[in-house]
Amino acid sequence: MAAVTYELIKTCKQSGARLGKLHTPHGTIETPIFMPVGTLATVKTMSPEELKQLGAQIILSNTYHLWLRPGHDIVKEAGGLHEFMNWDRPILTDSGGFQVFSLSDLRTIEEEGVHFRNHLSGEKLFLSPEGAMEIQNALGSDIMMAFDECPPYPAERDYMRPSVERTSRWAERCLKAHKRPEDQALFGIIQGGEYEDLRRQSAQDITSLDFPGYAIGGVSVGEPKDVMNRVLEFTTPLLPANKPRYLMGVGSPDSLIDGAIRGIDMFDCVLPTRIARNGTCMTSNGRLVVRNAKYARDFRSLDENCDCHVCQTYTRAYIRHLVKCDETFGFRLTTYHNLYFLLKLMKDVRQAILDDRLLDFREEFFEQYGFNQPNAKNF
């Protein structure tokens, strides 16, 4: 039996969005779902206990960063990532490919893998599909990702075509190198940029390998949102309906809703935690930059429509004071709220799918959030 299986519960009659369950060795996940990012085996400023209070069903950790610090051998010796960080719910690890391509200016791509420099020390390193599998097998995540090439946006077709073909060959090597298929699921990644024919080629190549799940990569890399939505519209239908679909690196509220409408089941992004550390909060009425001076005497909650612990307990004025003084507690509060907001949003999305009204929900949410305004500020 596969380590991870997908169960389709319902398709929204109004939108085509999917309500489902993802069964993993560490529990069942309700989808569509947002996955908080715990890059270094921690979601910044949050404890595992708080993540459970927030409603986090699954988190993501980063292969590249854990390879460098503390080292996958140490995590393996601890009993795997779940034991190491005291998290007994599912974990997804990315392959490290995105970091190799985004953090290192000096890199050389060859058929065997990628030569690059450690972004911390400048040391020369090499990562191959086999190496990415070895690291993730040691980490022991429930879901692993194949090692892929992550092209920039925009990229010319002449660059993208051989990149897609290389990603397909690397996917085959990942499958062969994967040592724990009975308790770790390996997902394949569809690439191809904004080119429909290359996305189709990539989807055909990758789905022919019969992975237990599929990700759409190469989005949220600087392209306009209408380009991303168009890519989803012609890529998602190419993926098997009985397997989970994961949109990598996407986490703004509008993109989560629009992704679900286009058949996506899983999302991850550093956005809610990163902007929280800048004093920016997601609220039902739009973006709120709590460090701004106008909140110095504002004794309301961050979001009067939110029932999270932070909004029930602390004021904008207090949180602004903490953030302005660089107090860690302030960043803990903004992070807690932002994660709660997105996880509650996905819960509402699931309910809207169940009620066959996701398009209506989108319209209501966008109107209240301000996305329908001509000069709407997104993240």
From Swiss-Prot:
<dbReference type="InterPro" id="IPR036511">
    <property type="entry name" value="TGT-like_sf"/>
</dbReference>
<feature type="region of interest" description="RNA binding">
    <location>
        <begin position="249"/>
        <end position="255"/>
    </location>
</feature>
<keyword id="KW-0862">Zinc</keyword>
<keyword id="KW-0819">tRNA processing</keyword>
<keyword id="KW-0479">Metal-binding</keyword>
<feature type="active site" description="Proton acceptor">
    <location>
        <position position="94"/>
    </location>
</feature>
<dbReference type="GO" id="GO:0101030">
    <property type="term" value="P:tRNA-guanine transglycosylation"/>
</dbReference>
<feature type="binding site">
    <location>
        <position position="191"/>
    </location>
    <ligand>
        <name>substrate</name>
    </ligand>
</feature>
<feature type="binding site">
    <location>
        <position position="148"/>
    </location>
    <ligand>
        <name>substrate</name>
    </ligand>
</feature>
<feature type="binding site">
    <location>
        <position position="306"/>
    </location>
    <ligand>
        <name>Zn(2+)</name>
    </ligand>
</feature>
<comment type="pathway">
    <text>tRNA modification; tRNA-queuosine biosynthesis.</text>
</comment>
<dbReference type="GO" id="GO:0046872">
    <property type="term" value="F:metal ion binding"/>
</dbReference>
<protein>
    <recommendedName>
        <fullName>Queuine tRNA-ribosyltransferase</fullName>
        <ecNumber>2.4.2.29</ecNumber>
    </recommendedName>
</protein>
<feature type="binding site">
    <location>
        <position position="308"/>
    </location>
    <ligand>
        <name>Zn(2+)</name>
    </ligand>
</feature>
<feature type="region of interest" description="RNA binding; important for wobble base 34 recognition">
    <location>
        <begin position="273"/>
        <end position="277"/>
    </location>
</feature>
<keyword id="KW-0808">Transferase</keyword>
<comment type="subunit">
    <text>Homodimer. Within each dimer, one monomer is responsible for RNA recognition and catalysis, while the other monomer binds to the replacement base PreQ1.</text>
</comment>
<keyword id="KW-0328">Glycosyltransferase</keyword>
<feature type="binding site">
    <location>
        <begin position="94"/>
        <end position="98"/>
    </location>
    <ligand>
        <name>substrate</name>
    </ligand>
</feature>
<dbReference type="GO" id="GO:0005829">
    <property type="term" value="C:cytosol"/>
</dbReference>
<feature type="binding site">
    <location>
        <position position="218"/>
    </location>
    <ligand>
        <name>substrate</name>
    </ligand>
</feature>
<feature type="active site" description="Nucleophile">
    <location>
        <position position="268"/>
    </location>
</feature>
<dbReference type="GO" id="GO:0008479">
    <property type="term" value="F:tRNA-guanosine(34) queuine transglycosylase activity"/>
</dbReference>
<dbReference type="InterPro" id="IPR004803">
    <property type="entry name" value="TGT"/>
</dbReference>
<dbReference type="GO" id="GO:0008616">
    <property type="term" value="P:queuosine biosynthetic process"/>
</dbReference>
<feature type="binding site">
    <location>
        <position position="337"/>
    </location>
    <ligand>
        <name>Zn(2+)</name>
    </ligand>
</feature>
<feature type="binding site">
    <location>
        <position position="311"/>
    </location>
    <ligand>
        <name>Zn(2+)</name>
    </ligand>
</feature>
<dbReference type="Pfam" id="PF01702">
    <property type="entry name" value="TGT"/>
</dbReference>
<dbReference type="InterPro" id="IPR050076">
    <property type="entry name" value="ArchSynthase1/Queuine_TRR"/>
</dbReference>
<keyword id="KW-0671">Queuosine biosynthesis</keyword>
<comment type="function">
    <text>Catalyzes the base-exchange of a guanine (G) residue with the queuine precursor 7-aminomethyl-7-deazaguanine (PreQ1) at position 34 (anticodon wobble position) in tRNAs with GU(N) anticodons (tRNA-Asp, -Asn, -His and -Tyr). Catalysis occurs through a double-displacement mechanism. The nucleophile active site attacks the C1' of nucleotide 34 to detach the guanine base from the RNA, forming a covalent enzyme-RNA intermediate. The proton acceptor active site deprotonates the incoming PreQ1, allowing a nucleophilic attack on the C1' of the ribose to form the product.</text>
</comment>
<dbReference type="GO" id="GO:0002099">
    <property type="term" value="P:tRNA wobble guanine modification"/>
</dbReference>
<comment type="similarity">
    <text>Belongs to the queuine tRNA-ribosyltransferase family.</text>
</comment>
<dbReference type="InterPro" id="IPR002616">
    <property type="entry name" value="tRNA_ribo_trans-like"/>
</dbReference>
